[in-house]
Amino acid sequence: MPRTFLVVLIYILAGFLCSTSALRKVNEASGIKTDGSGYTIVEECCTESCKLEEVNEYCHLFRGRFFCGEQILDIYNTVCNPRSIRRKRSLTVDKREAKKFIRQRR
């Protein structure tokens, strides 16, 4: 019985990994940029709603919601840079660091 459970679990995990890598390949083939952590980078959007123009080069579509401007800083701090949370640094970054982060995403 435990062996059957283990085999089923392995098949489920393998299916999940294959589906996520296949989705990533489909996105790359269709020109959709992804950063591997569930974000889809959508260029030239959120231009009117963004307050921080230096970070307003593109926004992220994450789990059906758009994030742009100052919200990119929140994404950077909470998801894209988890080491900053582990070091217990402040959850805000300056504009230079955010611009550097965006340049690296291209």
Curated annotation (Swiss-Prot):
Domain of life of the native organism: Eukaryota
Disulfide bonds: 45-50, 46-80, 59-68
Propeptide intervals in chain numbering: 23-37, 86-106
Major localization listed first in the record, in broad terms: secreted
Listed Pfam families: Insulin
Annotated compartments: Secreted
Signal sequence annotation: 1-22
Entry function: Insulin decreases blood glucose concentration. May have evolved to activate insulin receptors (INSR) in vertebrates. Molecular docking studies reveals unique interaction with the human insulin receptor. In vivo, insulin-like peptide injection reduces blood glucose levels in two models of zebrafish diabetes (streptozotocin- and glucose-induced). Also shorter swimming distance of zebrafish larvae, an effect which is not observed with human insulin.
Protein name, UniProt field: Insulin-like peptide 04
Source organism: Exaiptasia diaphana
